[in-house]
């Protein structure tokens, strides 16, 4: 006998939780922005702090949808993107999320969303559904994964 009792060997796993953290006022601001946009997609930059696998939203930077087909796509103009990044720099924050709405569909990334998620690295996308009035968050790693939205 080698002195090891395999009946008592335990395996431990560590689960990494990816979540984006907002407060209720921020969710209300995003909801209002989406509803005011009617049948057009709304969009915003989420500024905050990224710590390990958590993205903590400190400020919402609302933007206009500059896309030529705003009912099914969104584009943030280069001028507004620059303003958003300047605002983040002034406040010592980073881009920690991208928000947009799907006025007439579910809160899930479209094929177009997935394409643009690739361009933004590991930044969560929050999508609001006008059909169900709920929010869902996603991140692209090897594939698109839903992550938790924690409301503080």
PLM-predicted stretches and their roles:
Residues 101:
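Short, well-ordered beta-to-alpha junction loops that form the rim of enzyme active sites
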Residues 9-95, 104-152:
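Conserved beta-strand-loop surface patch within small alpha/beta domains used
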